[in-house]
């Protein structure tokens, strides 16, 4: 039986002569494994946006090739290897520039501060990668939920102080020849907060975290400034964008602060 010839419309010439900056697939869900700083393999679900630049001479890109790359696997990522899949996309799609954004939930086992009960804490992570010919740029973003306690409320109240959950978001780029781990950013944010969060707390743990937060009050301004001090001093980091959003327990709005620094 002879093969049927099917026209390759997307690979035909385009006469409008306009370059497309980004074209590809957005928000495709795929299972992945993330390898943490200790080498532990953490299975999770990734949401990918994968794009390339498109020449002014070509009508369309090869959409199916993006998904083929994911299906070929292995979809194992770490702080060391995210650039490999970006390079694979650029070469397979025959493009000068490739972009990948990967969102996933990162899980970390934590022990409660008094009882020692272990539970899994979740953090939202985004990896950003761009490869322009042979120049690669990779950044990571992590959202760290913490507790913040108001210094003003503590200073004026007899019986306690209002506190709330806050999200500290750190987007950072590693300096040349340096490795930056997700855990580095999580540890920093939790260390500077009034108190960190846990999935499970027994009564003695709840006493510890309540008192710890009371002993470490912080405005939203304090949170970003304290974290920025360490980010500025960290030679592993060449750029960062730092945000804190406090979901105020006594208001129907959030308090917010941002610091951004292109160090080098």
UniProtKB/Swiss-Prot annotation:
Family in the record: Belongs to the GTP cyclohydrolase IV family.
Pathway: Cofactor biosynthesis; 7,8-dihydroneopterin triphosphate biosynthesis; 7,8-dihydroneopterin triphosphate from GTP: step 1/1
Protein name (database record): GTP cyclohydrolase FolE2
Keyword entries, A-Z: Hydrolase
Site (described: May be catalytically important): 150
Top EC group: hydrolase
PANTHER family attached to this UniProt entry: GTP CYCLOHYDROLASE MPTA
Domain of life, source organism: Bacteria
Native organism: Ruthia magnifica subsp. Calyptogena magnifica
One GO biological process term: tetrahydrofolate biosynthetic process
Gene Ontology MF annotations: GTP cyclohydrolase I activity
Catalytic reaction equation(s): GTP + H2O = 7,8-dihydroneopterin 3'-triphosphate + formate + H(+)
Enzyme Commission designation: 3.5.4.16
Protein purpose: Converts GTP to 7,8-dihydroneopterin triphosphate.
Gene that produces this protein: folE2
